[in-house]
Each structure stands twice: as C-alpha cells, then as structure tokens.
C-alpha cells in the first residue's frame, strides 16, 4: 500500500512507501522494518528528501537522501540517524557549547557525537536483526565521519 500524504512544509516529499518527485519508491524489507519500528516506538516518520538528517524529537522526522540505495548506504544512513534518536543529553554535550566562543571544543564534541551515533546505530541493527555488511558499513561510516573530521 502506498500512502501519498502531502507534507505542507516539504512539498517535494510524500510519506511512507514514498512518492518522491513523481517516482514511486517502495521501501525494501530491512529499511521498512527500521522505519516501522521508529514509527511505532517513537512516532518518527522516515521520509525521502534532499538531505539525510534526524530533525529532532520535536519534529519526529528522519530524512534519507532520495538518491541513496535503501538496501545499502540508505539503510546504513537510516541506522546512523536511529543512533541519534537513541542518544542521551550526555551524548549531545556539544549542543551545550557556544560554537562562537569555543569552536574547536564544539567541533570535537560534535565529532564524538557522530561516532557515538554510528556505534548506537550498529548496536540497534544487531538488536533488531538487521543484516549489516560490516565492510560496507565501515565505508559509509568513514565517508560520513571524514566530513566532520575536516572541520577539526
């Protein structure tokens, strides 16, 4: 079943088994399993869009870039964003740092936060029974972390 509910703030996105820019893209089994879990447990919708990001517990949305392969880097990116969902206030310490006053400290703890989200995402995958090719996982993780390490 395909749901085509329009998001007013995001006119290019439709919900669930996803109509995106006129193209229907059904979620693969493992991606859907994670998406369904997030909806049931946290009320979080997983949507395809122009970015990959967890929009926060208030907005209850995770966007995965529409060009991602939802069986590989898209799934791993989703699991990483689940890692952010599972983070505690302590894990998000960098958000308490004034980036203008202490930019190096902010960027360092932001980098640590990203590593933590990857770790939590992998543990979550294991708990939910999601199959992960560890070599592919590490490749996607390292590509992502590299973008943060350049800021250090």
Regions found by a protein language model. Name each.
Residues 1-3:
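Non-Sec secretion/translocation targeting segments of pathogen effectors
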Residues 7-20:
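Short, positively charged and aromatic/hydrophobic N-terminal segments
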Residues 18-32, 36-72, 85-89:
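Active-site scaffold of zinc-dependent metalloenzymes
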Residues 25, 29, 69-74, 122-152:
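Long, well-structured alpha-helical subdomains associated
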Residues 55-57, 95, 143:
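Short secondary-structure boundary/hinge segments and terminal tails
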Residues 73-81:
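Short alpha-helical catalytic segment bearing the HExxH-like zincin motif
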Residues 85, 116-119, 123, 127:
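Charged/polar positions on well-ordered alpha helices
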Residues 88-119:
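Post-HEXXH active-site segment of zinc metalloproteases
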């Amino acid at each position: 079943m395909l749901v085509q509910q329009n998001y007013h703030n995001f006119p290019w996105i439709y919900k669930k088994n996803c109509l995106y820019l006129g193209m229907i893209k059904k979620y693969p089994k493992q991606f859907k399993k994670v998406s369904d879990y997030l909806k049931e447990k946290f009320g979080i919708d997983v949507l395809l869009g122009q970015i990959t990001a967890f929009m926060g517990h208030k907005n209850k949305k995770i966007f995965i870039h529409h060009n991602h392969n939802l069986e590989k880097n898209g799934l791993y990116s989703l699991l990483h964003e689940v890692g952010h969902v599972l983070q505690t206030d302590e894990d998000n310490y960098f958000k308490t740092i004034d980036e203008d006053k202490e930019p190096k400290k902010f960027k360092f703890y932001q980098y640590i936060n990203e590593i933590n989200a990857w770790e939590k995402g992998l543990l979550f995958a294991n708990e939910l029974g999601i199959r992960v090719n560890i070599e592919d996982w590490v490749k996607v993780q390292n590509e992502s972390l590299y973008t943060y390490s350049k800021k250090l």
